[in-house]
Amino acid sequence: MKERVVYHTGKWIPVSKAGMHIYDSQSFFGDGIFEMVRTFNQEFFILDKHIDRLFRSANYLQIPITKTKREIIDLCKETLERNKEHFPEGEECRLYINASRGPLPMYSEVFDRVEPTFIIDAWPLSKTAKSLGHFYKTGANAVVPVQRQIPARLLENKVKNVSRMHYQVANLEVANFNSDRDVMPLLIDEDGFVAEGTGANFIMIENGKIVTPELRNLLRGASMMYIIETLAPQLRIEVIHKNFDLYDVMNCDEAMFTGTFVNLLPCNRLNGRYINDNLKENPFGPITKKIADKWSENVGVDFIEQMKDWYQDTGKDGGYLSSLLGDK
């Protein structure tokens, strides 16, 4: 099987050659933006929403993107098509789109011309998600690290930027909590209100209603917005945005993480303690299950069984955080 190829700033190159230049603004400042997109049955899911957010992030950070939305969509499809032998039936794609302002002008003498960096990479989703399948059996244990969410007054959280250091610090802290096999970090803000996970949004169910944190201090995740804008109306579930703290989480009916890879992942514990005795045997509460089932129906894939199958195929018990941090 030949090597996968990556679209890298106007060229198609082997993935092994697709490095970030040492003088790129991302290397110096974490000055870049990105999007992660997945497929269902090898069709991109809400790709247009992700690209819209990419343009909003680029506009805020004044990162030039020289391509139109239509051109980017076509490039995404071409990236998958050029790598189709790596995506047999039953496999899905995790698409990574990255943009930066490119090499810093002070190093322009090194280059024939300085231009913005733009990368699209297609990676088998099962390899990314293989450590996540057991969460659908056990539920996630949300563990709160010392590391807080960076407040929007210091860094705009609605921008999906590559500056992920505070997330990684939280991951490192939480990975030391007992076993990292079933834990997920849950960040709170400087006022003690729940913000988000390090790679997913957090939602709780209270009195039959979907409750999300206020949207001012977190990334407006595409998956969370799909629940809010599409699934909730379809299921006639009311959505409330409000500040809530760990006390509220400990007394809610159900909870979940939601993000591109996991779609929806049930959370039944907070700092090792079950938030509801009814979630001990089955981490899916009735509303969480209803949302998950409707999601699967809409996309034509039982994503929960898909994730379980990928996990079973690995034959490993490696935790989610281990896949991000390696051996500490």
Locations of regions flagged by a protein language model:
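Helix-start/capping segments and mature chain N-termini
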Residues: 1-67, 71-78, 82, 106-328
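Short, flexible active-site-proximal loops enriched in glycine and acidic residues
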Residues: 48, 85-92
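Short, internal active-site loops enriched in acidic
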Residues: 100-105
